Amino acid sequence: MELITQKIRQCIEKVKDMSQVGFDRDYVIKDNKPDVSKVVCQNGQVKLDEIKASGENIWLSGSIEFEVLYTREEVFEGDEPEENIGGNRVEHIKDAIPFQEKLVLQGVCEKDTVRVYTGLDELTVGVINSRKLSVRGIISVELYGEREENLEVAQRIDDKDVEQLMGQMKVLKLDSAVRDIVRIKNVVTLPKTKPNICKLISSLVDMRNLEYTYERDHITLTGECHACIVYLSEEQEICCFEVQEGVSNEIRCEGDNAGNIAWLRTQPAMHQVEAENDYDGELRQLSIEAALAVDGKVWSEETVEVLNDMYSVSCPVKPVFENMKVCSLLMKNDTKCRILEQLYRENSKKRILRICGTKTQAAIAQIKNADTGIIVSGVLQVNCVNIVEDDGCPIEMHTDSVPFEQFVEIPGMDANTCCEVNVQVDQVQVNLLDNSEYEIKGVVSINAIALQQDEVSVITSVEQEKTSSDTEEEAALVGYIVQKDDKMWDIAKRYRTTVENIMEINALTSDSVKTDDRLIIARM
């Protein structure tokens, strides 16, 4: 009696957690840089190099990559003109501070896979003394513990003497786990209205309006690479240049069904901006390189035939059931959240003359369950580079955090629903209303996927059942009154006959019965 089964590859989420990690480091300014007087601008990102899991202990190793613009304490005699920047005394530091952090993710074991996503929620660079800076911030960490396993589903028994109750089950089959680095490179030329580049001072690079589509054997990732470049001209003036270039990349993955379901998460891995000569030999081109760490999955939604129950009228056998988790898709929902906020800089003594560019990121603060979905609360962080009214240092950066809240509809959620949410910036526009008041308009994309992980009883094997003496003495013909919740299959199995036999004896045209129906049953 052979049990015919089908193996279905699944990824079961076991546990998830969101936490924040604070860091506080001292940074000693290198000898080739002059003394610091005041920090003007700062920005940074988290670079995750290694994830080590040992049971419930998760070790994260990486670095905080940061950029700082600061004013010199004084202008040194003998400096080259380009180092004095026309008396503006602006200097640039770009470096990284390594970190290692231990987190605990309860419920995972050695065989599980741990996914980690990080973001830099806050960065503050202060002056300790003329040769030392304090770098402080908060890193947000998303942790997911999951396990790949094969669900073995019994589909039939290769024996004509066995009665089989068939059914259908919707499952989400894992076709491919995607993990890759997407590299982006653009070369842009300065507008004719902009002067030539003498020296790059700072660069803010981020990705916006990222979208992906699954097309049989690959995922197409499209979006916009946004860069704000601050440079020194040949006339020793500080200039700003903002550019936005479209990008498109293909990520290879398994699967050949155009209707497959894809889920993708991206994280910035690096960026680099270099000045290059154009065809005329002038320094008017910018090479912008960026890399995104891509992590995701591709599923196919299938309806499979399953063997729900079985028995034999000729020999005493019984199925052995085991509870297993079955993953299915509840909903995938993409929502846009529009943001409009007016802000006023009360404590600033410098008048804003022009907003040069921005760097943005969106982060989740909290996810709450609602009646028919979830409420996602988060923060849109906008770093603005401004030209201000200050002959000594005409450039500054300020960071604004604009809260947002959006309801995402996911009907049918319960305790067995696993929901993952990703937020990213689509558009941001900062308009200067007057010299101290400005307006932030933005669109944040909120992507949510909800998977149902229900525990289902499935047949894993068939074993021989002992024959009792009472069975041999039972009457060959019995009368039966249908009880509440009785089904024809259960009645036939109890009296070791077949559904077809009961229907034939009682002249029934359907196998449906209702309470208090009277049946004649002939044992086989």
Model-inferred region functions:
Residues M1-E473:
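Interfacial loop/beta elements and low-complexity acidic/Ser/Thr-rich segments
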